[in-house]
Amino acid sequence: MKLLLRSLTCVLCLFGVLTLTACSKENRQDSLAKIKNLEFTVISEDCIPDELRKVILEKKDSPFKITYTDNGFLYICIGYGEQPGGGFSIAVNELYLTENAIYFDTTLLGPEPGEETANRETSSYPYLVVKTEFIDEPVVYK
């Protein structure tokens, strides 16, 4: 009788653990689901707020990720550090909101193979600043 009771208790505990694990995975997937794409504007250098511009200049030598808020807007910045030569651009693949974060996905695009750049002996410091509505969520860079 005791053996049967112990076996039944073990089976119930195992069932409970499996049920709780399955539920937590489902909740995690729901929190990563895209709620909506966010509208954004790529900001030119002369439109970047002064305080943010100073921080970018300090950090431009190395890759960086910065967020900045001002007047109801969220500025999301990414820099790719020092790159040899010029001809680089940055593509925004996605900017979207989930239940608990803003996801920002970009790609650094370099000069095409064989494409002449202005001067291979100089360096460039590609970075991108986008402006979107302020949402009080952390930014996840992909």
Report residues per predicted region.
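Bacterial N-terminal signal peptides that target proteins for export
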Residues: 1-10
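Exposed, flexible binding/inhibitory loops of compact, secreted disulfide-stabilized domains
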Residues: 7, 22-142
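Bacterial Sec-type N-terminal signal peptides, specifically the leucine/valine-rich hydrophobic h-region
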Residues: 17-20
